[in-house]
Amino acid sequence: MAQTSTNSHPSSSDDQLRTKLRNEALKERSEMAEPYRAHKSSVICQSLLESLDLTLGITGIAPEDACVAVYSAFPEEVQLNDFIEELYERGVRVAFPCMIKDSWSCNDVEQKMEMRAVDAVSYLGKHVPFLLHPLKSYLHESEELHAFPYICARDLTMIVVPVVAFDKHSNRLGYGGGNYDRYLTQISSDCRKIGVAFTEQQVDSIPAESHDIPLPILSI
């Protein structure tokens, strides 16, 4: 197995390797049969609930005072529906990613990710604009977002991160935008961080960059 390198200035060969590994993992994921993917997602959701229970037990935080950041899955990603619905059942506050652009920007290139709280009625009724259009970016003060309160990163109890590829050292690859890399630097050290993926997405070794934040990966 190749050694994992840590570079402050990644070489073009590392960039090419990361792209290659990302594409290979996405291909493996896309070839999974839907019933198989659904079963694995269900098992992962149960494990996430166990992790949440452990976190609440350690911190002493009551479910109604907890806030968990999740994501609205694309069809081939780990589906979190069972986990999310159980969070609502327990009275946990649930937050989802929303892409934000600066008011002076005329395009979606200059953007960042923040978390917004979504209530159960809006989630189940599919009335959330940034879940219906996850790639669209919004102004922070947009009227479309008024019903979904901003969540400070340091107030999160737990965050679940979608992972494209990972290795045994907990190095990971996302889709290449760096949104979670930037966001994870803002959260509290007490926040439980978990990346989720299928075992089919594991690769031998990912060349790490200095800004990368390794994540415990929950994979089935």
Residue ranges and their predicted role:
Residues 2-154:
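N-terminal active-site beta-alpha-beta segment that forms phosphate/nucleotide-binding
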Residues 103-220:
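Conserved phosphate- and dinucleotide-binding cores of soluble alpha/beta proteins
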